[in-house]
Swiss-Prot record:
Protein name, UniProt field: Large ribosomal subunit protein uL14
Gene: rplN
TM helices/strands, residue ranges: none
Source domain of life: Bacteria
PANTHER family in alphabetical order: 50S/60S RIBOSOMAL PROTEIN L14/L23, LARGE RIBOSOMAL SUBUNIT PROTEIN UL14M
GO annotations of cellular component type: cytosolic large ribosomal subunit
Amino acid sequence: MIQKETNLVVADNSGAKKVRCIHVFGGTGRRYAGLGDQVIVSVKAAVPGGVVKKKDVCKAVVVRCAKEQRRKDGSYIRFDENAVVLLNAQGEPRGTRIFGPVARELRDRKYMKIVSLAPEVL
């Protein structure tokens, strides 16, 4: 579960390394974001020469979440870290590579570009 002020790892090669959630999409009172949900993040650490710089504000989608999430078949999925992939204005990933596994819930949410770039879908 991701909420405001949650520190996240970036799972793509857009140039950002660490980001912080500053808003969760989905209505006024929505507090938490899970796998496949969109958030607005602020870049806290970035590599020199990357597409994004420190202090940039951009949209992102949650691809790994440390809090277990229940699936329709009754199983649970959880990861070791909270990770996001940065998105452009059209909702496509800003980077050209995805690092680490991503959740199957992204396929249900129509993030097919992220699913195809990911090395593993769990």
